[in-house]
């Protein structure tokens, strides 16, 4: 009886993607009119409906809540955020 070498363990497989693939432009077009979270470089979050944005990432939002450390500190009907302050934009609801 010859000892056969055991097969080498396989490296773990990356998890299956849970989001749609596409360009950032496709994502941004898809979230206009939807609820989003905008995180600023300062760490402040704005949650609301994305009205529009431009090529400089300047953002207009409606029904906006400003949160610091997870706590809502202000509510605005409309909010305008200058793009150079934006760290990221994420969907706050399925797209």
UniProtKB/Swiss-Prot annotation:
Family annotation (PROSITE patterns): SM
Subunit details: Component of the heptameric LSM1-LSM7 complex, which consists of LSM1, LSM2, LSM3, LSM4, LSM5, LSM6 and LSM7. Component of the heptameric LSM2-LSM8 complex, which consists of LSM2, LSM3, LSM4, LSM5, LSM6, LSM7 and LSM8. The LSm subunits form a seven-membered ring structure with a doughnut shape.
Region named Disordered: 1-27
GO MF annotations in UniProt: RNA binding
GO annotations of cellular component type: nucleolus; P-body; sno(s)RNA-containing ribonucleoprotein complex; spliceosomal complex; U4/U6 x U5 tri-snRNP complex; U6 snRNP
Chain's role: Component of LSm protein complexes, which are involved in RNA processing and may function in a chaperone-like manner, facilitating the efficient association of RNA processing factors with their substrates. Component of the cytoplasmic LSM1-LSM7 complex, which is thought to be involved in mRNA degradation by activating the decapping step in the 5'-to-3' mRNA decay pathway. Component of the nuclear LSM2-LSM8 complex, which is involved in splicing of nuclear mRNAs.
Protein's name in the database: U6 snRNA-associated Sm-like protein LSm6
Highest taxon listed in the record's lineage: Eukaryota
Keywords attached to this entry: Cytoplasm, mRNA processing, mRNA splicing, Nucleus, Ribonucleoprotein, RNA-binding, rRNA processing, Spliceosome, tRNA processing
Skewed-composition ranges (Pro residues): 1-17
């Amino acid at each position: 009886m010859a000892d056969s070498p055991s097969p080498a363990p396989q490296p773990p497989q990356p998890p299956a993607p849970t989001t749609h693939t596409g360009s950032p432009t496709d994502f941004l077009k898809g979230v206009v009119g939807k609820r989003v979270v905008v995180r600023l470089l300062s760490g402040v979050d704005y949650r609301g409906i994305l009205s529009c944005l431009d090529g400089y990432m300047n953002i207009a939002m409606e029904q906006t809540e400003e949160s610091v450390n997870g706590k809502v500190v202000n509510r605005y009907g409309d909010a305008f955020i200058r793009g150079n302050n934006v760290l990221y934009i994420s969907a706050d609801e399925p797209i």
